[in-house]
Regions:
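Crotonase-fold acyl-CoA enzyme core
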Residues: 18-34, 45-56, 63, 69-127
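A glycine-rich, hydrophobic loop/mini-helix early in the fold
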Residues: 8-15
Length: 181
């Protein structure tokens, strides 16, 4: 139950971001470096995703027989096709910003170090024109909060059944991440 409660709290955060917090604004994510799992899902919940060239993206959950449960399928489908969504979610490899741009998953790739300026440029010059189009995108392909809730319930049920080998692998990956920070 605790896992489900925490998962639903994460869903609330990405859903509110996707819905622009109920305000007339555009949410933008800037990706610098590796963007994996839940971090990638959080970025995808923005209306606009800008990445620096060296950024890499992926869903490593498949390595431990899980799938990303915080909206990956829902958000990728609203940017691309079911085929691309399934390819991304079932592949543990990291993909470059350029590859993500080609697949239609992100909106803009800029040189390393130019991300903050690109976000400012977008907000100053392109956002006023794009706001209406982004609203149309949400209308044509709406996201119902229940969709995210149902997926997180499936994720929790799946996570509760993972085996010891997968738990050990997760532990090793967490330990390696901790060494990086």
């Amino acid at each position: 139950r605790r896992v489900l409660f925490r998962s639903l709290a994460c869903i609330e955060a990405v859903y509110q971001n996707y819905m622009s917090y109920g305000l007339p604004l555009t949410t933008v994510s800037l990706v610098q470096g590796d963007c994996l799992g839940g971090g990638f899902e959080a970025a995808l919940s923005s209306q606009v995703v800008i990445a620096e060239r060296s950024a890499r993206f992926g869903f490593p959950e498949v390595m431990f027989n899980l799938f990303p449960g915080m909206g990956a399928m829902s958000f990728v489908l609203r940017r691309s096709s079911m085929k691309i969504a399934e390819e991304l979610i079932s592949n543990p490899d990291l993909l470059s910003a350029g590859e993500m741009l080609q697949k239609g998953i992100i909106d803009l790739v800029v040189n390393d170090g130019e991300g903050p300026a690109a976000v400012n440029e977008y907000l100053r010059h392109k956002e006023p024109m794009a706001r209406g189009l982004l609203q149309v995108r949400r209308r044509v392909r709406p996201l119902d909060r229940r969709e995210l809730d149902d997926i997180v319930q499936i994720w929790v049920d799946t996570a509760m059944r993972i085996n010891t080998r997968d738990l050990k692998l997760m532990g090793h990956l967490i330990a390696r991440q901790d060494k990086l920070h």
